[in-house]
Curated annotation (Swiss-Prot):
Pfam families: Ribosomal_L22. This protein binds specifically to 23S rRNA; its binding is stimulated by other ribosomal proteins, e.g. L4, L17, and L20. It is important during the early stages of 50S assembly. It makes multiple contacts with different domains of the 23S rRNA in the assembled 50S subunit and ribosome. The globular domain of the protein is located near the polypeptide exit tunnel on the outside of the subunit, while an extended beta-hairpin is found that lines the wall of the exit tunnel in the center of the 70S ribosome. Belongs to the universal ribosomal protein uL22 family. This is Large ribosomal subunit protein uL22. It comes from Malacoplasma penetrans (strain HF-2) (Mycoplasma penetrans). Part of the 50S ribosomal subunit. One of its GO terms (cellular component) is cytosolic large ribosomal subunit. GO terms for biological process: translation.
Length: 135
């Protein structure tokens, strides 16, 4: 079973947000919370709030136990970009891109769920290869 939470249009660059996402990927929820507490990045604050929301979704909506949860999937995708200009010499201007991020966290309580998914993908690839042998 999976529970997820999404936060859109956070005023952080996706490149910087991915660094913090990599810290908590595939970790138990308690470890992920302690890592985010001790990470001195702006994104860590947003991810901590989002992780609490995902835990609440898992316990309230899906009746999962909070102590068995782990971070199954966490991603920072590019959101909208605000474009501003900065004046330069001789009447020209540079473009300033103020990037935004969409964060998504998926929690799972089944440790073998990822292995089952990988095995299903491998089976599909084998089946496809067996069908294409004659070509």
């Amino acid at each position: 079973m999976q529970a997820r939470a999404i936060q859109k249009n956070i005023h952080v660059s996706p490149r910087k947000a991915k660094l913090v996402c990599d810290l908590i990927r595939n970790k138990p929820v308690t470890n992920a919370l302690s890592i985010l507490e001790n990470t001195n990045k702006k994104t860590a604050v947003f991810l901590k709030k989002l992780l609490h929301q995902a835990i609440a979704n898992a316990t309230n909506n899906h009746a999962m136990q909070a102590d068995k949860l782990y971070v199954y999937h966490v991603v920072a995708n590019q959101g909208s970009t605000l474009k501003r200009t900065s004046p330069r010499a001789k009447g020209s201007a540079d473009l300033i891109r103020k990037r935004h991020t969409h964060l998504e966290i998926v929690l799972s309580d089944d440790v073998n769920e990822r292995n089952k998914e990988i095995q299903a993908i491998k089976d599909r690839i084998k089946k496809r290869a067996a069908n294409n042998k004659g070509y």
